[in-house]
Amino acid sequence: AAAEFFDLDEDEKDRISMRHGGRAWRGWFPVGGELTSGVPDGKEGIYFGSELGHDHPRVRAGVPLHGPNLFPERPADLRDVVLEWMDRVTEVGRAVLSGIALSLDLDADWFDRWCADPTVLFRIFHYPPPPPGFAGSWGVAEHTDYGLLTLLVQDDTGGLEVRVDGRWVEVP
């Protein structure tokens, strides 16, 4: 469903532009619409989060990263796929945190009191080929993710790397 969305023309994707998402930080951004280390990223993407209506107390209070998601008309199944995926990945995150707690000789539910109602930021990125004649690096510059836990899935194209002991290692 995500690939189908990214295949749409920019005018259609722009209907759910992040400029409509406000403090909730939801919606689509174009290639170059985000900067990392001051350099435009060679990706486009969509931001989603926990689905909260306008009447939710955090939304009414204007708490950043809280609010309704912006879903496109097409593909029609993207909404259901994203909401189901976020629920499942949130459960995976809880399981990972339980494993971390156990590895630290803590109770498996040690993180629960701080993560009972997590702020979920779910992003889908598309890295199109660089434009003809482009000589710089393409993708996203070196950075550190924020938040407690980042779970990543990449397609068969690859390209994701992590820095370990000062050297870059490809992630399978």
What label would you give each PLM region?
Residues 1-172:
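Peripheral, non-catalytic segments flanking oxidoreductase cores
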